[in-house]
Amino acid sequence: MRTSEIAKRFLDYFEQHDHLVVPSASLISPNPTTLFTIAGMVPFIPYLMGEQTPPKHRMASNQKCVRTLDIDEVGKTTRHGTFFQMLGNFSFGDYFKEEAIHYAYELLTTPQDKGGYGFDPEKLWMTTFTDDEEARSMWKNEGVDPEHIQIMGMEDNFWTTGGPGPGGPCSEIYVDRGPKYGVEGGPIADENRYIEIWDLVFENYEVDNVKSKTDLHIVGELENKNIDTGAGLERLAYLMQGKQNIYETDEVFPVIEAAQKLSGRTYGDDEAMDVRFRIVADHVRSALMIMSDGVRPSNNGRGYVLRRLLRRTVKAMRELGVTEPVMPTLLPTSKAAMEPSYPELNDTFHDVSEAAYGEEDAFRRTLESGTEIFDMAVTKAKQGGSDLVSGEDAFKLHDTYGFPIEITLEMAADQGVKVDEAKFRELMAEQKSRARADALKKRHNVDLSVYDDFKKTLLQPIDFLGYTDMSARAKVLGIMQEGKGSVPAVTGPANIEVILDRTPFYAQAGGQLADQGEILSDDGAVLEVDDVQKPIKDLIVHQCRLTEGTLVVGAEVNANIDLERRGAIARSHTATHMVHKALREELGPQATQRGSEDAPNRLRFDFQWSSAPSKDAMNAVEARVNEKLRENLAVTTQEMKFDDAIALGAMHLFGEKYGDIVRVVSIGEDGWSRELCGGTHIDHVGKIGAINIMSEASIGSGVRRVDAVVGQGAYEFNAREHALVSQLSDMVNARPDELAERVNMLLAKLKESDRRLAAMYESQLAASVPTLVAEAKASSAPVKVAKKNVGHFGSFDALRKTVLDVRGQLGEDAPVVVALAGMNEDGKPMVAVATNEAARKQGIKAGDLVRGASKVLGGGGGGKPDFAQGGGADATKIDEALEALAGQALKG
């Protein structure tokens, strides 16, 4: 029975028993403290805790889950996996223990031809909580052999949330796999032979003061008792399919089969290699499912977990002997295996695959550059009589070559050495400390504690008025200078930081740049406000230039923002929301915000997307925004509960912390765009005028950036573009509507000229072959060196072809080195070197020769022993480089 059919039977059974079947929730956990959905009951926690009313009091689901705490153990055993599916039935104040036990037993033991799972009742064992005589009696009533009902304590068979809330005893169902898997005696005796497949939790107590599983306080019984069960789908699958473990099931093993074909190895021949096969099978599936829920590789949070899964896959395949890209084979294989259960995988697969392929390409380059350095670090340690790779070397691998410490640790373990992790962590901490110090210096401060100390003196929070007021009367609460605590007074000219009791100035946040303006005191002090920041939560600090007079603490002032700048930034910020919405309409819901900057007349928007959107797609985004501008949609703001905002469909940033009450900015009466946002906006989008997308490019793995001009910036761009078109039309003697055709014609002519020039260079190279061969053969030196400065050579392929041609004609009668150097189309010097087998037997390697020659040219290079290439910056030293190379070759 296929895994998808096992899941379907579970859901069909409980639907027939009046349960509402709900689809799996996203793997992205709604809880900001948890990266992923880690258990089947997670989406139902608000119902179990009594915080929300469920749509029905009986529910069932097949929930996708990811746990990566044991990622290092994956593959080493056949029981660990990062992605799994949890079947569950739930009751919220409806049925309780007796029905839950009956449902589970009936589904498990009903024959398969009658819709059940067909487990032999004699193979089933149950564990129950010490004090739960009621559950034991109910199992007996179902016909379970009393000898198969075992008793366990609080540690194993009592469930809590880990804090105050519901709790209760549980009963676990096990399957006996037979004597070849271990000793008899039930789950208490051997959990390798007896495999847990289903856990029934009976929540009937209110628990308080949970210190540990064995140290908790039961307050009393719950008014509404709940049922929370979880059956591991993968475990059910391998037992029902007659397999040995989860890796041999129909949803996982196809990836192992694909890895076998790529590697030429056979799963089961070698345990060390089997570990790699299992890592690949598990991680590819996990990565596929995580990416399908919108996560993309990054350096933090969920994105980093995903990145690690993909990188461990590539590394494991390399250890299986595969150096070419593997994701284009493995990912579609996993998708085909999982699609019967998740047909929606097809909807996002194009973007998912692009992200995975791009991540693999980047990591393969990292592996190629870092592996050699790692090997050198291991050699250095062993030559020093140590089995410890230094923390300095591990840090260099991480900092210079982008080699993740996890990969370094795994490779070290594979080679039987360790890594000085303590020193590595120390160096990482020092680097972070330097980065924080640099950031503080950029804010003209050395220590945030001065702000913390000042904030403690405030009697009430600072009042931000900037949503409605552009100027305000205020009182000076504090003056800071040179990163020191508040001073009573400062006389200008001076650079100072000013804290007011109330302010219309917007502090930089959420991508929106700060307001600028002026502060004028009643006693004559004049301050130009250049920037406004929140160095710590809820403290608004105005960074000012005191140009006239003396400012004293307690002074009454007028605070006036620059209205023109505020308006320009507000237009950009509203336009950013519109670009975000239009991108999601054009590309799909995975195009989510990763960052932004809203400045006067321009915006920058970073979004999650793995591949370059087409030019047509970006044109459509621009056109869509301008269409909405012409509709002059209203912009409204409203404060509401976070859950209510999400229910309305408001966009928010995953990983961002929000309060219970949030501010929602909506564009259009029907909420065409709706986002959680604390920034400033215009009241109607028509005031933006126009937007032009200037560029779209990658700024990192899986992250793209849009730069656009807005309002006056867009008008100025259009004027410049019109002038440029007129100028180009005059230059090529064509009307504006003929410009593209005329430029294409000129480019075609240029391409033909380049082709002829390349053919000439290639002909010249070919003509030099007979002379090079003859001169080398005539040489009496122990190593035949054929070298030449060919001048301009056109394409490097032609140079490489000539080098290999000369080597082939010189044969294997004597050691041969062929070295040609010249200038590419950019005038940069390059060198190509080939050696024959006779030379390599004497230790003469092309890579070594190229490195020496490239050093003379002021550059670098490398390659394999039989062929290598390099280059530099100083073309005047080509002859010198060739002479140095020849001398090195003759020394052997």
UniProtKB/Swiss-Prot annotation:
Which GO molecular-function terms appear in the entry? Answer: alanine-tRNA ligase activity; aminoacyl-tRNA deacylase activity; ATP binding; tRNA binding; zinc ion binding
Q: Which SMART domains match?
A: tRNA_SAD
Q: Could you say which residues bind Zn(2+) here?
A: 573, 577, 677, 681
GO BP terms: namely: alanyl-tRNA aminoacylation
Q: What is its EC number?
A: 6.1.1.7
Does the keyword section mention Cytoplasm? yes
Source organism: Bifidobacterium adolescentis (strain ATCC 15703 / DSM 20083 / NCTC 11814 / E194a)
Swiss-Prot/TrEMBL domain comment: Consists of three domains; the N-terminal catalytic domain, the editing domain and the C-terminal C-Ala domain. The editing domain removes incorrectly charged amino acids, while the C-Ala domain, along with tRNA(Ala), serves as a bridge to cooperatively bring together the editing and aminoacylation centers thus stimulating deacylation of misacylated tRNAs.
Tell me where in or outside the cell this protein is found. Cytoplasm
| Name the record gives this protein | Alanine--tRNA ligase
Q: Which GO terms describe its cellular component?
A: cytosol
Q: Which family does it belong to?
A: Belongs to the class-II aminoacyl-tRNA synthetase family.
Q: Which cofactor does it need?
A: Zn(2+)
Its keywords, alphabetically, are: Aminoacyl-tRNA synthetase, ATP-binding, Cytoplasm, Ligase, Metal-binding, Nucleotide-binding, Protein biosynthesis, RNA-binding, tRNA-binding, Zinc
Q: What is its main location?
A: cytoplasm
Q: Give the protein's biological function.
A: Catalyzes the attachment of alanine to tRNA(Ala) in a two-step reaction: alanine is first activated by ATP to form Ala-AMP and then transferred to the acceptor end of tRNA(Ala). Also edits incorrectly charged Ser-tRNA(Ala) and Gly-tRNA(Ala) via its editing domain.
One Pfam family recorded for the sequence: DHHA1
Q: Which reaction does it catalyse?
A: tRNA(Ala) + L-alanine + ATP = L-alanyl-tRNA(Ala) + AMP + diphosphate
| Record text on cofactor binding | Binds 1 zinc ion per subunit.
